[in-house]
Amino acid sequence: MAEITGLVLPFFGLIFLGYLTARLVDHPGEAMGWLNTFIVYLALPALFFKLVSRTPVEELTRADFILTSVGTTYVVFALIFAIGLFLRRNTVAEATMQGFAGAYGNIGYMGPGLALLALGETAAVPVALIFCFENAAHFTVAPAMMAAAGGSKQKPAVVALGIARRIAFHPFILSTFAGVAAAFLSFEPPLPLQRLIDYLAQAAAPCALFAMGVTLALRPLKRIPAEIGYIVPAKLVLHPVLMYLALSLGGAYDPIWVQTAVLLASLPTATNVFVIGQQYGVWQERASATILITTLLSVATVTGLLYLIRSGALPADLFP
């Protein structure tokens, strides 16, 4: 257990330092803009490119793994959406936000750093594949559902064009595809460029985690919404359990790939859920509360999951 604590403490410690710094130092929220720009447009794309470009091409074309992992995430989304819409009688827009809160994990800011730290560089490819295709799905579903709910005043063709543009030009997706192309062509960047990529990649995890802590501090918890009662268990427990079962039933996967997918599924609600709510003017305060609560509780749940993985108590294939 001491080994697991040694893995998790620096990771969540960076989030805590970001939170503490934001509470102690009086800076406006806009001051985070350039740090987030550095993370989203430079550091994390460099990390994805570096890791994917060094991977054998055959490992980058596992459509079965992609469909199973993304499909499992949307099973959780559909379940929470149905609870919100039919049992709680919320609007389509509110139920959509609840679905994202229960299924959209913080795989961008938390995923790469934690997976690589806990499972090694072999985890890089499943992290990149899950992140790339899951975010492409989120970028498609969110505006489509909000348009169906009447939360968007744009014409369907404009919505569709916006979705395609957002997916095609997202820096994470572009860097992943660039990494795939480099792997296919066996391209190695010149040494000065490779060093620059390395510097940016090394900055990705600490900057992203610190920024996440600051973001949590800037959105203080005002009240605990009732939906927390089913969203939190769905995100922190149901999602990783279903991911584990689906991959165990779905085929023969590398144990590290299974463990990576389960670990990513166990992560707390993504800060992008608040951004979506803010964009459409729905469920903003509750999204902020959900992100904060799931992040706090994930210290225990993620630590427990890592203990199961590292101790061998969680076999890679439940049905060998």
UniProtKB/Swiss-Prot annotation:
<feature type="transmembrane region" description="Helical">
    <location>
        <begin position="1"/>
        <end position="21"/>
    </location>
</feature>
<feature type="transmembrane region" description="Helical">
    <location>
        <begin position="32"/>
        <end position="52"/>
    </location>
</feature>
<feature type="transmembrane region" description="Helical">
    <location>
        <begin position="167"/>
        <end position="187"/>
    </location>
</feature>
<dbReference type="InterPro" id="IPR004776">
    <property type="entry name" value="Mem_transp_PIN-like"/>
</dbReference>
<feature type="transmembrane region" description="Helical">
    <location>
        <begin position="113"/>
        <end position="133"/>
    </location>
</feature>
<dbReference type="GO" id="GO:0055085">
    <property type="term" value="P:transmembrane transport"/>
</dbReference>
<feature type="transmembrane region" description="Helical">
    <location>
        <begin position="289"/>
        <end position="309"/>
    </location>
</feature>
<dbReference type="Pfam" id="PF03547">
    <property type="entry name" value="Mem_trans"/>
</dbReference>
<feature type="transmembrane region" description="Helical">
    <location>
        <begin position="256"/>
        <end position="276"/>
    </location>
</feature>
<comment type="similarity">
    <text>Belongs to the auxin efflux carrier (TC 2.A.69) family.</text>
</comment>
<feature type="transmembrane region" description="Helical">
    <location>
        <begin position="65"/>
        <end position="85"/>
    </location>
</feature>
<dbReference type="InterPro" id="IPR038770">
    <property type="entry name" value="Na+/solute_symporter_sf"/>
</dbReference>
<dbReference type="GO" id="GO:0005886">
    <property type="term" value="C:plasma membrane"/>
</dbReference>
<protein>
    <recommendedName>
        <fullName>Putative malonate transporter</fullName>
    </recommendedName>
</protein>
<keyword id="KW-0472">Membrane</keyword>
<keyword id="KW-0813">Transport</keyword>
<keyword id="KW-1003">Cell membrane</keyword>
<feature type="transmembrane region" description="Helical">
    <location>
        <begin position="196"/>
        <end position="216"/>
    </location>
</feature>
<keyword id="KW-1133">Transmembrane helix</keyword>
<keyword id="KW-0812">Transmembrane</keyword>
